[in-house]
A protein has these predicted regions:
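Charged catalytic carboxylate motif
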Residues: 43-47, 96, 103, 202, ...
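Glycine- (often His-adjacent) and acidic-residue-rich active-site loop
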Residues: 46, 50, 60, 68-103, ...
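Terminal peptide-recognition signature
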Residues: 29, 33, 47-48, 66, ...
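Conserved CoA-thioester-binding segment of acyl-CoA-metabolizing enzymes
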Residues: 8-69, 102
Length: 272
């Protein structure tokens, strides 16, 4: 189905905790610390960030998929590493994680989270930064930081409320309770819930569908939706019209609209 799953090599260093493979134009990043339920250590965060950055720069990757090995997507932060840190150290650690999540959110390419198991704390924060979330029936999601005497540190309080609303976000965060996949879908936290064995096939099918369309239009759409988060509707509508108009100088606009007028059934975009 895909190129052989491999560890990622950056600057001569093998990163064993991150696996990367390409399936046509889909990049698949697999978190691979199953012995710790893929807990986020500082080194692991850096490995993920480097791999995401490389996938973003790869012109052959149109859509990025994130998933985990074993029982966990990401089960949270590595508490053993985090426990002895002081304020300056933990601020630096959380800054690394925040940079990763900001990159996922702002990168032009769509990012899909295939939540295969536990997505807790920092793991849910990673998933929240993705554009689309599919979950297995066995997945558990939550932000349990209050149970440890702390709060989210890489965007959880900011993104969860935007996705599920303030009241539900506050209940989840104030109680630290984990919810199951069906509840996550009910509140709009995930798009779809599937049996474990159907999760990746469904995610790849979705990614393949996105890959079929003009990527300039896909990326312009993501920019406009992201812009709406921080601007009023007048500013957002102007920004949308600007991106819409810019696409009328592209080959893809001529190919897409021309193909529609000619009633072509299989339009091949060139992404330029």
């Amino acid at each position: 189905m895909a190129e052989n799953c491999r560890t990622v090599q950056q600057k001569g260093k093998i990163m064993k905790n991150v696996l990367f493979e390409k399936h046509n134009h889909i990049g698949i990043i697999t978190f691979n610390r199953p012995e710790s339920l893929n807990a986020l250590s500082s080194g692991f965060v850096q490995e993920i960030h480097d791999t995401v950055k490389a996938a973003e720069a790869d012109d052959e990757v149109y859509v990025l998929v994130l998933t985990g090995t074993g029982k966990s997507f990401i089960a949270g932060a590595d508490i053993e590493e985090m426990y002895p840190m002081g304020p300056e150290e933990i601020f630096e650690f959380s800054s690394y994680a925040t940079e990763l999540n900001m990159r996922l959110e702002k990168m032009p390419k769509p990012v899909i989270a295939a939540i295969n198991g536990y997505a807790l704390g920092g793991g849910l924060e990673v998933a929240l930064a993705c554009d689309i979330r599919y979950a297995s029936e066995t997945a558990k999601m939550g932000l349990p930081e209050v149970k440890l005497g702390v709060i989210c540190g890489s965007g959880g309080t900011q993104r969860l409320c935007r996705i599920v609303g303030d009241s539900i976000a506050k209940e989840m965060i104030f109680t630290g309770r984990a919810i199951d996949a069906q509840e996550a879908m009910r509140i709009g936290l995930v798009n779809k819930v599937l049996p474990q064995e159907e999760l990746m096939p469904a995610v790849l099918e979705l990614a393949e569908e996105i890959c079929r369309y003009g990527q300039l239009a896909i990326r312009a759409s993501k920019k406009c939706i992201n812009f709406a988060q921080d601007h009023d509707i007048e500013e957002g509508s102007l920004y949308e019209r600007q991106r819409f108009s810019e696409l009328f100088v592209t080959e893809d606009q001529k190919i897409g609209m021309g193909g529609f007028l000619r009633k072509e059934k299989d339009i091949k975009f060139k992404n330029r």
